[in-house]
């Protein structure tokens, strides 16, 4: 699975799909792997289905995922949440927003929902026109994760949504936060972020522009 992991990280989903098709899942182990503390995780067969479903979704073949995902959900109860998420993502990619929303709502209706599930749920709500609810859930996602570098896209989307609903200061704070984190990590900054920040600076016409991540983070939480 090392090749699959590398291809996934590079976003080479066609390669992922080709590799999984060269493997017969029925001959793969169903014994869960364990970590150093003895906790059980994924097995080879469940990993195969995960890679296969993701590859189909990312290559615009989500309808094929829906043909087998329910069986997989029942087959691997330990990974149930992840496969149900893939079902929701398939519906979303196919434009079936109502079914996607229902599934994400159920997945997130727990004591401590994963931040990335909240993020995906919010995207569905945005497309449903429920922008205030989407913003609330995006902010819930942002405070649920301490790894800022993993949330640069989330911060960008919060910023763009804030701008869309007229919250200009909040929009700039989140876009600057995304930009500053990208700079610190040595990542490129999309023109859409830079251009929107300049536009907001012109609209706000003030001197409260944060110069570092801590300042931007504090402003985004106000």
Label each residue range with its predicted role.
Residues 13, 62-63, 97, 131, ...:
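TPR-repeat structural position
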Residues 1, 9-17, 22-43, 71-80, ...:
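Flexible helix-coil transition and linker loops at the boundaries of alpha-helical arrays
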Residues 1-2, 11, 40-50, 76-85, ...:
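Generic helix N-cap/helix-start motif at coil->alpha-helix transitions
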Residues 27-33, 77-81, 111-119, 145-154, ...:
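Boundary/linker segments of alpha-helical solenoid repeat arrays
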Residues 20-25, 139-144, 162-187:
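TPR/TPR-like (Sel1-like) alpha-helical repeat modules
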Residues 10, 59, 94, 128, ...:
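Structural motif corresponding to the intra-repeat A-B loop/turn of tetratricopeptide repeats
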């Amino acid at each position: 699975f090392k090749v699959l992991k590398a291809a996934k990280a590079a976003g080479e989903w066609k390669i992922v799909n080709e590799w999984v098709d060269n493997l017969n899942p029925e001959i793969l182990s169903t014994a869960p792997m364990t970590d150093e503390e003895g906790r059980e995780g994924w097995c080879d067969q469940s990993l195969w289905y995960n890679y296969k479903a993701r590859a189909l979704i990312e290559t615009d073949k989500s309808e094929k995922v829906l043909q087998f995902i329910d069986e997989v959900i029942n087959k691997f109860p330990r990974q149930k949440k992840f496969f149900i998420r893939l079902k929701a993502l398939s519906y979303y990619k196919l434009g079936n927003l109502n079914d996607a929303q229902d599934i994400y709502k159920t997945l997130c209706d727990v004591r401590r929902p994963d931040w990335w599930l909240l993020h995906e749920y919010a995207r569905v709500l945005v497309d449903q026109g429920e922008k205030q609810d989407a913003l609330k859930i995006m902010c819930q996602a942002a405070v649920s994760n301490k790894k800022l570098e993993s949330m640069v896209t989330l911060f960008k989307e919060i910023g763009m949504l804030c701008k869309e609903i007229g919250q200009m200061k909040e929009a700039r704070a989140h876009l600057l936060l995304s930009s500053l984190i990208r700079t610190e990590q040595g990542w490129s900054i999309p023109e859409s972020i830079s251009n929107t920040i300049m536009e907001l600076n012109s609209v706000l016409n003030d001197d409260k522009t944060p110069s570092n991540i801590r300042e931007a983070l504090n402003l985004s939480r106000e």
